[in-house]
């Protein structure tokens, strides 16, 4: 434990909390051509690459992902949730925060049912998370 004199000289330094989704905390002013510190819950971007990757050790699958260039100029890797998707290069997507635990470097999710991303077909439960409309009653 420090002495009173050591605390008077140096003092306690509080920890700085870093964001888990830093690309959502940057904006871009295209008129002034400068980056701004504007936080937003989602951001729009254009897919530059769509593909699959394999998860970390105990799991085995082909997880769908997209490399997305956001409106603030930052390029991030985002996970495509749900079964099947219609994304390809140059698709305009909406990104939200939220990492995928077994995919290293994937800190963002693509919002299904927004912009060019279609909702998941034939989904009955948890539809709001996958952008699926309510099925018609027969």
Curated annotation (Swiss-Prot):
It comes from the Bacteria. Residues 33-55 are annotated as: Disordered. One of its GO terms (molecular function) is rRNA binding. GO terms for cellular component: small ribosomal subunit. The modification 3-methylthioaspartic acid is found at residue 102. GO terms for biological process: translation. InterPro entries: NA-bd_OB-fold (IPR012340), Ribosomal_uS12 (IPR006032), Ribosomal_uS12_bac (IPR005679). CDD domains: Ribosomal_S12. It holds the Pfam family Ribosom_S12_S23. Keywords: Methylation, Ribonucleoprotein, Ribosomal protein, RNA-binding, rRNA-binding, tRNA-binding. With S4 and S5 plays an important role in translational accuracy. Interacts with and stabilizes bases of the 16S rRNA that are involved in tRNA selection in the A site and with the mRNA backbone. Located at the interface of the 30S and 50S subunits, it traverses the body of the 30S subunit contacting proteins on the other side and probably holding the rRNA structure together. The combined cluster of proteins S8, S12 and S17 appears to hold together the shoulder and platform of the 30S subunit. Part of the 30S ribosomal subunit. Contacts proteins S8 and S17. May interact with IF1 in the 30S initiation complex. This is Small ribosomal subunit protein uS12. The lineage of its organism: Bacteria, Bacillati, Bacillota, Bacilli, Bacillales.
